[in-house]
Design a protein with these regions (language model features):
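Short, low-complexity, polybasic intrinsically disordered segments
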Residues: 177-201
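Acidic/histidine-rich, metal-coordinating catalytic segments
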Residues: 164-179
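Low-complexity, intrinsically disordered regions enriched in charged/polar residues
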Residues: 2, 115, 169, 182-185, ...
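Active-site-adjacent loop/helix surface patches within enzyme catalytic domains
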Residues: 2-167
Length: 201
């Protein structure tokens, strides 16, 4: 897999990136130095990608990563996407102007009812799909990411780090207090430390 003309080309783990047209453009993303990781909080990758591509949806992203590791690209990497919203990090605001947005197909925070786990859209998840986090003595439940997803996101981020001077890899929750993604089930700290060694050995 490689980047050509700001689009992913060829295959990774036997899968090629699908291109889904998204006409929501806010200008040129000239010097991205940040990657923002999100979860879709949706039912599946393709439905989330189509939702983000819709003209009447006030959001978009560069990529959606499916649970099997498949990639859907909505926008070229040199185009501003609407993924960060009202945001602030490292002294800057409006981070869509500086960042590449990657959405991962994941239901997000789950809720436990009568020993079972459900998403906000009322889909049940089996216990082996659930990550349990405990904050201040209170258990919180999250939809697990798949190994294939994490491997694909890592590979894409490596390509982006080679193509652009990326200095920051952050979760959406780190740039705004309105969001929780990518949530406690994503190993963000280790992921970030390993990747940023590429540009800062």
């Amino acid at each position: 897999m490689y980047i050509e003309n700001h689009l992913l080309k060829d295959t990774f783990a036997g899968r090629s990136a699908k291109q889904l047209h998204c006409n929501k453009k806010s200008g040129l993303l000239e010097y991205p130095d940040m990657i923002v990781l999100h979860y879709t909080a949706g039912g599946n990758a393709m439905s989330s990608a189509h939702y983000l591509a819709r003209a009447d949806t006030d959001a978009s992203a560069h990529l959606v990563i499916a649970r099997d590791g498949g990639i859907i690209q909505l926008l070229p990497f040199d185009t501003i996407a609407w993924h960060a919203g009202q945001s602030e990090y490292a002294g800057r605001t409006n981070l869509n102007r500086y960042s590449i947005g990657i959405e991962m197909d994941n239901a997000g925070e789950l809720h436990r009812r009568e020993g079972k786990f459900y998403s906000w859209f009322n889909r049940e998840y089996m216990p082996d799909e659930v990550y349990t986090d405990c904050i201040n003595g209170r258990a919180r439940y999250w939809h697990l990411y798949t190994k294939e997803q994490i491997m694909t996101v890592y590979a894409v981020c490596r390509l982006l780090l080679k193509a652009d001077p990326i200095h920051y890899i952050v979760g959406h929750s780190e740039i705004t207090n309105r969001k929780l993604d990518p949530g406690a089930a994503f190993p963000l700290k280790q992921f970030r430390e390993q990747l940023l060694k590429i540009n800062n050995p």
